[in-house]
Every structure is written in C-alpha cells, then in structure tokens.
C-alpha cells in the first residue's frame, strides 16, 4: 500500500497492559529475606535462594499466595483449583539465576474484570490473567540513561520480592483510559492491604500498542485476525500512572507518523525514557517460545482450592462509595474524596460516628485533606492525633471558636507546629468574643459606616455583608457571623 493510501486510512490505537504489582509481605516469595528495608545497602538483603546459587531450593511464601487470591476475588476472577510455577528463561543482568520463577499455562487467576470511568463513561476492562512471580533485581545506570550510561550497577535486594502480574485484554483505545485503569487498580490494591503505593517500584507497567484499521473494529470489538496481522510494540520502564499516559501518547503518535509515511511498524520492545519523554528501541520483541517455559521442578503444584474460601476481602472502593452516598447522604464528589484510600474512608467513618455526617464530611474532605495534600502528608501521618482533630470539630460545633479561625489558623498550626487546638487558640487569642464585646463592635461599626447604614435602609443587600466584615475585623474574627448579622439588623432597624 502506498504512503498516500495509508495516510487516508483511519487507525485506532489498541492497547493492552501488563501491570507488575509488588505484594506487601514481610519476606520474599521463595526465601526468608526481608522485603521491608528499602534503604538497606545494595546487595545486603540476599541469600543463596534469591541469588540463584547452586543447591539452593525455593520455599513458597504462603502470604504471597493469600495476597494473590485477594486480588483475584477483587477482580471477580476465576481462581484456579490448582496452580503451578514455571521457569521463564532469559538472560539479563538483573536476573541472577538466568531464569525467573513465574507461572505459564496455570495462572492462579484468570478471566476477571475491573470497572473504570473515563469522562463519566463507565465500562469494564477484561483481565486475561493474573499470576505470581518473583521480581528481578534493579539496575542503576551511571552517567546516562539505558543507552548512554558509562556503566550499570546491579542491586539484588529486590530480587525475589513477590510480584503479581496482571494482564489485561487489549481493551484500551486511548492513553487516558490506561491512566484511569491504573488509578482504579491501585485504589483496589490499597484497599486490600497488600500494596504500598508509596514504595519505589511498587507498580510498574509494560504496555503493548498496535494500530488497527478502524474498519476492522466492530462495536469496539476487534477480530483476532486484525490483532494478529498488526505488528505490536511493547513499551517497558513505565513506573507511574502519569508516565503511562505520557509514554503511550508518545508511542501512539510515533506509530501514526510512521504509518502516514508508509513505514512498517517494527515488532519490538522499546524503553520509555522519562527524562527525555521518548521511547527508545531496546530489542526485537520476544515470542513466547523464546522463553522456553518448563515446569519448576523444585516447587510442587499448589492446591489453592483447599483454603481459598477462607480468605476474605474488605469492602471495596466502589461499594464503599455507594454506601457513603446512601448512608451518609453525601454527594458523588464528597463520596469519591472520602473513599480515595481505605485509610481516608476509615478516618471519615470514625469522625462521622461522633458528629453529624455532613459536618464530618466537610471537615475531612474539604478542610483536612486539602491541608494534608498541600503539605504532602496523608491521613496516616496524623493517625495518633485523631482525638485532637475531633476536638477541633467539637470546638466549632459548640461555637467556642469560629469556623474561619478553625480552618485558617488552628488546623494549619496543628499540622505545621504539632500543637493541640487549645494551645493554638490560647497563643493566637482566638476564643469567642463575649456578647458585650460583640455588641460594642456592632455599635461601633454602625456609627463608623453611615454610608453603609444608608445603603442598608435603601435595600442594598451588600451593605449588611460589609458591616458584618467590619465587626469581624474589630473582634479579630472571634465573633459568630450569624449572631453578628442578627445584632446588626436589630440595631439598624432601631435606627430607622
């Protein structure tokens, strides 16, 4: 086909993801080495098993299997009655054994799905499979990137960390959809308590991208023949949701430009260079046969059926969001904020147990989360100060302090200076003004603002707001605005 003919055809991007999730366990998947100290010196959290030394035998970590079953249940996947491990053979510096213990034709989970929303359109993404494997070591390129470095250092501390690889069907049609999926997946994993999103390298993505002629797509479905006839590019080294969207946007554009120029899309593996914002060719893409899979003889088949029903999962984000809307009468935006992580949802429910849910939602969703985000903090950072936070809400609810002062002064100093609410109120002199002080301030504001008084009597609504502001200024913000409004109207009516 000529370049002109190619340029006239309409193509659709077809994307599938392979998401590598580090499971949060105390030890590695096949040995007793710790996974907890991410700041350990390089190559100190290792043993003969994770270094692949002769004679060392793997022992499966039960906690990793339990975590995998939880993922399967959360994804509504079929969980295998019996599963098996295989050796995936390839040579790379971060793989000390020259093979990776993974799963081939007997994954622990298959045929799942995950709901996502993109621009208010909700749909299901099909999960082809999810299997357990061990993480390789990590590489640090010195003096450049992967293709320009002077040399590369290898750290095997990560080798053997439990990984779950979640493989989607090629269900994505845009980079934005992949970002929405990764956001949702991370949210679910955090709720399960098996994943730490703050850990370095805890979620890494490989993406497969093809351009398919739009006429070969029927109602969103793509024929097997169309998929098999299109050359596919795999992009590696994606380590964030935002990075995934950027990498895929670049790669889709690169492929479109190539097609429009009449060039063939090479079937290859490319590396996402985040610093330069481009993908770089690494090698021709391996076929499945290149890995020479065969059963791992040192690990017997695993009968998951014997205990998978004993493994439970918590209420998941979508269900909790819906419950919050119904039980606490929250709007969709507030419910989404308050269920963004399990820790936030738990925190809110603890506050809502003590106060009106609407008040609790306002304070947690609008005030607290905003101040925490500004400081790059999370709810987990103030878990031990829960009583102080509820005390602040109680002071506002009892009208011992104004909402404005509580939000703009007390809460901020509580977080910045680690002070109690009482300490901030005392140091800033923020206690409520007594009634005599407020009456005096009201009288003064009226006497000093004859134009505003005249405007009020002329029916101009803004005049009363101006006078309230004057009183609040005189009382240092310690008066109750609603009471000030009432007192002002009373005195103004008396002056008619």
Swiss-Prot record:
Residues 475-496 are annotated as: Disordered. It comes from the Archaea. Its EC number is 6.3.5.-. The keyword Ligase applies. Gene3D superfamilies: 1.10.10.410, GatB domain, N-terminal subdomain. It catalyses: L-glutamyl-tRNA(Gln) + L-glutamine + ATP + H2O = L-glutaminyl-tRNA(Gln) + L-glutamate + ADP + phosphate + H(+); L-aspartyl-tRNA(Asn) + L-glutamine + ATP + H2O = L-asparaginyl-tRNA(Asn) + L-glutamate + ADP + phosphate + 2 H(+). It is an enzyme of class 6 (ligase). InterPro entries: Asn/Gln-tRNA_amidoTrfase_suB/E, Asn/Gln-tRNA_Trfase_suB/E_cat, Asn/Gln_amidotransferase, Asn/Gln_tRNA_amidoTrase-B-like, GatB, GatB_C_1, GatB_Yqey_C_2, Gln-tRNA_amidoTrfase_suB_CS. GO terms for molecular function: asparaginyl-tRNA synthase (glutamine-hydrolyzing) activity; ATP binding; glutaminyl-tRNA synthase (glutamine-hydrolyzing) activity. SMART domains: GatB_Yqey. GO terms for biological process: glutaminyl-tRNAGln biosynthesis via transamidation; translation. Keywords: ATP-binding, Ligase, Nucleotide-binding, Protein biosynthesis. Heterotrimer of A, B and C subunits. Belongs to the GatB/GatE family. GatB subfamily. HAMAP family: GatB. Allows the formation of correctly charged Asn-tRNA(Asn) or Gln-tRNA(Gln) through the transamidation of misacylated Asp-tRNA(Asn) or Glu-tRNA(Gln) in organisms which lack either or both of asparaginyl-tRNA or glutaminyl-tRNA synthetases. The reaction takes place in the presence of glutamine and ATP through an activated phospho-Asp-tRNA(Asn) or phospho-Glu-tRNA(Gln). NCBIfam families: gatB, PRK05477.1-2, PRK05477.1-4. This is Aspartyl/glutamyl-tRNA(Asn/Gln) amidotransferase subunit B. It comes from Haloquadratum walsbyi (strain DSM 16790 / HBSQ001). The gene is gatB.
């Amino acid at each position: 086909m000529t370049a002109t003919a190619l340029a006239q055809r309409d193509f659709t991007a077809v994307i599938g993801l392979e998401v590598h999730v580090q499971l949060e366990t105390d030890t590695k998947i096949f040995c007793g080495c710790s996974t907890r100290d991410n700041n350990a010196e390089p190559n100190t959290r290792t043993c003969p098993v994770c270094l692949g030394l002769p004679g060392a035998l793997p022992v499966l970590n039960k906690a990793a299997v339990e975590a995998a079953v939880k993922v399967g249940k959360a994804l509504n996947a079929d969980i295998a009655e019996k599963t098996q491990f295989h050796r995936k053979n390839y040579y790379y510096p971060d793989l000390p054994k020259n093979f990776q213990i993974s799963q081939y034709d007997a994954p622990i989970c298959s045929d799942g799905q995950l709901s996502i929303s993109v621009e208010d359109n909700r749909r299901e993404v099909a999960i082809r499979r999810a299997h357990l494997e061990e993480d390789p070591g990590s590489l640090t390129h010195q003096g450049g990137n992967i293709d320009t470095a002077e040399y590369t250092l290898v750290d095997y501390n990560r080798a053997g960390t439990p990984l779950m690889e979640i493989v989607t069907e090629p269900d994505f049609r845009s980079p934005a959809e992949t970002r929405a999926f990764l956001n949702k997946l991370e949210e679910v994993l955090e709720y399960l308590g098996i994943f730490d999103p703050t850990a370095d390298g805890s979620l890494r993505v490989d993406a497969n991208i093809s351009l398919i002629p739009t006429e070969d797509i029927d109602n969103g479905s793509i024929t097997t023949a169309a998929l098999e006839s299109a050359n596919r590019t795999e992009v590696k080294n994606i380590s964030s949701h935002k990075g995934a969207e950027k990498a895929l946007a670049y790669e889709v554009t690169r492929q479109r430009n190539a097609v429009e120029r009449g060039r063939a899309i090479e079937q290859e593996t490319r590396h996402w260079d985040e610093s330069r914002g481009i993908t770089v060719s690494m090698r021709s893409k391996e076929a499945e046969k290149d890995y020479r899979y065969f059963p791992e003889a040192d690990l017997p088949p695993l009968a998951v059926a014997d205990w998978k029903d004993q493994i439970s999962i918590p209420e998941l984000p979508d269900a909790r969001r819906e419950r919050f809307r119904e039980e606490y009468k929250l709007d969709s935006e507030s419910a989404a904020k308050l269920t963004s992580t399990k820790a936030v949802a738990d925190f809110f429910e603890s506050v809502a147990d003590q106060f009106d849910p609407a008040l609790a939602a306002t304070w947690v969703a609008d005030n607290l989360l905003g101040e925490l985000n500004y400081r790059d903090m999370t709810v987990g950072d103030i878990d031990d100060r829960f009583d102080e936070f509820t005390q602040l809400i109680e002071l506002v609810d009892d009208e011992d302090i104004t909402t404005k002062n509580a939000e703009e002064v007390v809460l901020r100093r509580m977080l910045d200076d680690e002070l109690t609410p009482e300490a901030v109120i005392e140091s800033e002199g923020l206690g409520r003004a007594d009634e005599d002080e407020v009456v005096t301030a009201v009288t003064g504001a009226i006497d000093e603002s004859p134009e505003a008084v005249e405007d009020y009597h002329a029916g101009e609504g803004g005049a009363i707001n101006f006078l309230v502001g004057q009183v609040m200024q005189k009382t240092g913000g310690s008066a109750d605005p609603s009471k000030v409004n009432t007192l002002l109207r009373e005195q103004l009516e008396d002056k008619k």
